[in-house]
């Protein structure tokens, strides 16, 4: 098997940052593409056909492998991950633990829970099983290659990992420092999300519906709000986006611009 690697200064899990790698894969005989950020602690993965395997799905692949050796183990994942991840971990004999987004929060939860593996949507993947408990993109890539080396068809194996319709992260940049945290406090104080089955306030608001979820949280590093949406189909995705549009419209001007950028991820 052959693979291609690429290094990016920005997040290697973001669609825009992977286009060069996707083009190269389509014009070569490589079976897999790996992307790393500048300091090598984050990983992105692309199939031969150009399908991006986002980090929450990579965590499915990795946790299944780890739990086959360590049944009952804990797997930590961040608030932005797919709703399919927790039941996947349980089905494979593990214990899912939800964490706030952020390197220090994930690492802290991993240590508290004595987790075997942890990951977040930014592409940080942590291993304590057969490793030292920190995030290392090169090592995560090696673990993925180890698993995929047992498959006759790498793309088929990765494509089989379950997924729903979803958007990439949407970043709403605000002019005033601290305004993002004020908005989250107001939304948590007076949540208005019709039809919600559950509202998780661990990190912003993750509003769970029977057929999807919407998330809005304050960035830890910039004066911005970060959103992500997931649904069983396009209609569900649009419905959840519209609910969040209504909830945020009194706080953030020019929402139309941001929501026009939130086209669904291209699921192949």
Where are these regions (language model features)?
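Phosphate-binding and adjacent anionic-ligand microenvironments
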Residues: 32, 70-268
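Alpha-helix C-terminal capping/helix-to-coil transition sites in glycosyltransferase folds
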Residues: 3, 27-29, 112
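N-terminal phosphate-binding loop and adjacent alpha-helix
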Residues: 9-22, 188
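Short, small-residue-biased leader/transition segments that mark boundaries at the very start
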Residues: 1-8
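Alpha-helix N-cap and loop-to-helix initiation/capping positions
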Residues: 12-16, 51-54, 136
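Gly/Ser/Thr-rich beta-alpha loop segments that engage phosphate groups in nucleotides
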Residues: 5, 40, 52, 121, ...
């Amino acid at each position: 098997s052959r693979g291609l690697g690429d290094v990016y200064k920005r997040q290697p899990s973001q669609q825009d940052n992977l286009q060069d790698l996707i083009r190269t894969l389509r014009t070569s005989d490589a079976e897999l593409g790996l992307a790393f950020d500048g300091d090598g602690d984050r990983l992105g993965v692309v199939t031969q056909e150009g399908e991006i395997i986002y980090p929450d799905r990579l965590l499915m692949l990795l946790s299944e492998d780890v739990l086959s050796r360590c049944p009952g183990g804990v797997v930590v994942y961040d608030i932005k991950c797919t709703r399919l991840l927790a039941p996947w971990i349980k089905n494979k004999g593990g214990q899912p633990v939800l964490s706030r987004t952020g390197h220090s929060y994930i690492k802290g939860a991993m240590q508290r829970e004595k987790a075997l593996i942890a990951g977040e949507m930014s592409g940080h993947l942590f291993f304590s099983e057969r490793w030292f408990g920190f995030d290392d993109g090169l090592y995560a890539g090696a673990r993925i290659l180890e698993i995929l080396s047992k498959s006759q068809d790498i793309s088929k194996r990765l494509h089989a990992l379950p997924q729903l319709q979803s958007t990439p992260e949407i970043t709403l940049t605000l002019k005033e420092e601290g305004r993002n945290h004020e908005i989250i406090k107001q939304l948590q104080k007076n949540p208005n999300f019709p039809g919600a089955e559950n509202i998780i306030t661990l990190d912003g608001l993750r509003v769970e519906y029977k057929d999807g979820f919407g998330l809005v949280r304050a960035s830890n590093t910039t004066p911005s709000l970060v959103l992500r949406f997931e649904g069983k189909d396009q209609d569900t995705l649009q419905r959840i986006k519209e609910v969040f549009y209504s909830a945020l419209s009194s706080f953030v001007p020019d929402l139309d611009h941001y929501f026009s950028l939130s086209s669904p991820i291209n699921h192949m």
